[in-house]
Amino acid sequence: MKLIKKITAIMFAFIMVVSMSCNVKAVGTGKITISPANPNEEYKIYKILNLESYDETKQLYSYTKTGDQWDAFIDLAVTEGYLKINTDGYVTFSTTKGSPADVREFARKALAYATTNNITATSTKTTGANDDSATIDGLDLGYYLVGSSMGALCSLDTAHPESYN
């Protein structure tokens, strides 16, 4: 399980480092797949950034604030050096805090913020006794925090378009 968490953290760190502005407008809905997922566990998904545009082939994503309770957390993350906001209002991930440990810490802080501020999850998914994965679809495109009822999972991911493989 620790190896999977490390690999996931490295993957998310890579996505965060290459995230930057591009000129394709994000349209449609997306999905997040949690694999492996623990049986009989509730996963809460929180949208923390809007996805304005993306280029799937280059793995480039342009994010903006959501205009809700997450904006204060995003401002705090900018102050702490995890994120940057450029002059056009696009949120990018800092290259100075892009290590797997930094990504995990950012995710932990985001989940603590959601709990402390009683933020309602954008979506929830409960796995069955025999489920080893969970897919949450129909999500607005954006950057999401995923937390579990057991605290076993704490990660960040982009809701990819439904056609994304």
Question: Where do the PLM segments sit?
Answer:
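Solvent-exposed loop/turn and edge beta-strand elements of beta-rich ligand-binding domains
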Residues: M1-N165
